[in-house]
Structure formats: structure tokens, C-alpha cells
């Protein structure tokens, strides 16, 4: 803008040129701020990928669904109990005599998830969660459904709701799933 006003014959001390210079300086400051933030963001996620690549991949996959951090942490807290040994070291390929994968799906889902990669399992989770919560949400709370689940704002409550309505596991393990959810929340959000 300053160059254009000079071309029109304005002096360097004209208000339009001074304004353009100030706007350019402000833009430089903002650019530097956002470049620094981007570098910090990249470093944050690089560190997480290096330390816990599978947990990070799951977190980002479910975050891409526009689910809040509490929902993501609650789901991941359950996965940590299923195939992480209570840690973020998720081993998605684990199976038992009757169960497989990040949610230890039963043989009834063999054709959909058994022997599949992480992305396929994450997509299966996303594809089935609404039906499961709409169908079995009552086990958590009367009238509870998928939309209610997405509105929860406490990772421990999300972990409990997911455990009883999606995983349908023993209630004895719920406190561990809840503490895992808090670990996941603290790791990925804090």
C-alpha cells in the first residue's frame, strides 16, 4: 500500500504511508507470533508421536470427528484398559481367544475388525459408537444417547458412559478406566 501511494506522488510522511508502514509492522508481529505457535504445536505433537505413536494416532483420529477433549480422553482411557495395560502404550493388534483390537471386539465382529490395522479399527469405532450408545446408553443413565455422550464435559464420566454403553464391561474396572481417561486428558490436553 505504501508503494502504491508513493507512486501517486505522496510523501513518505503522508498519513496513508505511515498507516501502511504501521500495518505492515503489525502484520510482521502477528506473523512471528503465529509461526512461533505453529512451531510449538508441531513440537508438541512430534513429541507425542515419538513417545506414544498409537495413542496419538487414536487421539487425532477421534479428534477429527470434532469430539471434545473429554470425549476423546474417556474413549482412550477405556482403550488403555483394553490393550494398553493401563498406559498410553496401546497395542492395537492384541487378541485373546474371543476378542481383538483396541476395544477388544468379540468374534461377532470378526469380519469387520479381526486382523485389521489401526485406522480400520478407529473407523469401525466411529462407525458403530452412535448405534451402540443410542441402543445401550440406558445402562449409563435413563434416556442417555450418543448426543448426550458428546456433550459430556468430564473425562471420567465419559469413560464410565463408554465402558457401560459401548464396551459393556464389568463395572469393577470402571474406576481404572476413569483414572486412565484422566491420564490421557492430562497428556494430550495439558
Spans of model-derived segments:
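Peptidoglycan-targeting cell-wall enzymes and recognition modules
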Residues: 37-60, 64, 80-154
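Short, functionally critical alpha-helical segments immediately adjacent to catalytic or ligand/cofactor-binding
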Residues: 69-86, 160-163
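Catalytic cores of peptidoglycan-degrading enzymes
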Residues: 1-3, 84
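Solvent-exposed, polar/charged alpha-helical surfaces in well-ordered, non-transmembrane soluble domains
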Residues: 56, 60, 76, 123, ...
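Acidic-residue sensor for enzyme active/binding pockets
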Residues: 23, 82, 167
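Active-site or metal-binding loop neighborhoods of secreted/extracellular toxin and effector enzymes
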Residues: 151-190
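Intrinsically disordered, low-complexity
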Residues: 4-70, 174-190
Amino acid at each position: 500500500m505504501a508503494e502504491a501511494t508513493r507512486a501517486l506522488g505522496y510523501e513518505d510522511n503522508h498519513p496513508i504511508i505511515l498507516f501502511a508502514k504501521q500495518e505492515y509492522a503489525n502484520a510482521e508481529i502477528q506473523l512471528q507470533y503465529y509461526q512461533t505457535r505453529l512451531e510449538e504445536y508441531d513440537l508438541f505433537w512430534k513429541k507425542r508421536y515419538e513417545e506414544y505413536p498409537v495413542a496419538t494416532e487414536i487421539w487425532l483420529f477421534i479428534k477429527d470427528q470434532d469430539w471434545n477433549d473429554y470425549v476423546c480422553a474417556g474413549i482412550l482411557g477405556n482403550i488403555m484398559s483394553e490393550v494398553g495395560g493401563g498406559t498410553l502404550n496401546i497395542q492395537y493388534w492384541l487378541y485373546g481367544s474371543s476378542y481383538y483390537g483396541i476395544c477388544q471386539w468379540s468374534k461377532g465382529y470378526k469380519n469387520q475388525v479381526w486382523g485389521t490395522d489401526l485406522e480400520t479399527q478407529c473407523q469401525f469405532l466411529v462407525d458403530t459408537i452412535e448405534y451402540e450408545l443410542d441402543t445401550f446408553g440406558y445402562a449409563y443413565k435413563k434416556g442417555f444417547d450418543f448426543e448426550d455422550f458428546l456433550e459430556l464435559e468430564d473425562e471420567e464420566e465419559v469413560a464410565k458412559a463408554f465402558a457401560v454403553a459401548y464396551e459393556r464391561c464389568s463395572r469393577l474396572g470402571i474406576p481404572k478406566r476413569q483414572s486412565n481417561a484422566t491420564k490421557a486428558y492430562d497428556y494430550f490436553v495439558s
